[in-house]
Amino acid sequence: MTYGEAVADVLEFGQSEGEPIGMAPEEWRAFAARASLHAARAKAKELGADPPWDCELAKTPEGYYQIRGGIPYAIAKSLAAAPFADILWMETKTADLADARQFAEAIHAEFPDQMLAYNLSPSFNWDTTGMTDEEMRRFPEELGKMGFVFNFITYGGHQIDGVAAEEFATALRQDGMLALARLQRKMRLVESPYRTPQTLVGGPRSDAALAASSGRTATTKAMGKGSTQHQHLVQTEVPRKLLEEWLAMWSGHYQLKDKLRVQLRPQRAGSEVLELGIHGESDDKLANVIFQPIQDRRGRTILLVRDQNTFGAELRQKRLMTLIHLWLVHRFKAQAVHYVTPTDDNLYQTSKMKSHGIFTEVNQEVGEIIVAEVNHPRIAELLTPDRVALRKLITKEA
């Protein structure tokens, strides 16, 4: 029993006996919810309702005072600290928007501009919260609407480092240095600054310090011409610039003003599903293909196309998607393209690409999928440096 509850019991007993109590129990509870123990005890003595209550007797062997935790306690403590705090943080046992809202509304009722913090804790098992995937995705956004301006994960970095190291060590044991090559490919794909490691570990700064301390007479540098970092600047994959050059030819033929830009990224961070997007000068997304490169049991590379869109009606029926598919097949060395849950547009497109010689076979009778086999001799013809065949494809001469 808290001191406030003990006093409330005394007041209720006195009230039931018809004694003058000086303050209604409900009024006392409202006062005690915000008052310190010293202020509450002084008020209780003033009311003649100071019960025998000793917080020292309930201390734990370690010396901790016992409290009744919960949202009301967190609110009371935070309201007391609010005049002196830049930001307030309430720790919870699980992720719950209702709890967060109760706390936020109580604080903002008295301090409307008070900033709040929320721990998106890895201690929570987020799959036991009862939230759907979409609710989890929007959870930080909903917190922001309540005034939680600082949302953090206490030891997320520790877990990320642990899982990444564990996965990489296991991959090294299973696949040798192919594991590192795959990691480097991913870093190049997302254009991570970690792909040039010497820069991030302080190579340029070390060289600058050495030059300064030696009066610029030092001849040994970490970042000289022989630095292994320069290996990571070599273009090892088919560049996006190639598709941008094709799109420039395409735009010129159709007299389109936008200079088109190509972006290739994971559809969502960490996902194996990729998105190739075509953007205009205003950064509007004009077209995209969502796909995943996989290998079958025979080691053949297959592009699984999950979705594709041409967002501007003026860009359709101009073989834009054909150019995009040509580049994807070239970039990922695909032997086949599979369209999952295909649309009528996919049916039309694959039949046309077969007529252009890009596909040798198109099977549309394999459940909810279209299987298209790539015609590599035709692909090689379209990729010749003179671009004669490619230009004819763009201009519909052949």
UniProtKB/Swiss-Prot annotation:
<dbReference type="InterPro" id="IPR006254">
    <property type="entry name" value="Isocitrate_lyase"/>
</dbReference>
<keyword id="KW-0456">Lyase</keyword>
<dbReference type="InterPro" id="IPR040442">
    <property type="entry name" value="Pyrv_kinase-like_dom_sf"/>
</dbReference>
<comment type="similarity">
    <text>Belongs to the isocitrate lyase/PEP mutase superfamily. Isocitrate lyase family.</text>
</comment>
<dbReference type="Pfam" id="PF00463">
    <property type="entry name" value="ICL"/>
</dbReference>
<dbReference type="GO" id="GO:0019752">
    <property type="term" value="P:carboxylic acid metabolic process"/>
</dbReference>
<comment type="function">
    <text>Together with AceAa, they could catalyze the formation of succinate and glyoxylate from isocitrate.</text>
</comment>
<dbReference type="GO" id="GO:0004451">
    <property type="term" value="F:isocitrate lyase activity"/>
</dbReference>
<dbReference type="InterPro" id="IPR015813">
    <property type="entry name" value="Pyrv/PenolPyrv_kinase-like_dom"/>
</dbReference>
<protein>
    <recommendedName>
        <fullName>Putative isocitrate lyase subunit B</fullName>
        <ecNumber>4.1.3.1</ecNumber>
    </recommendedName>
</protein>
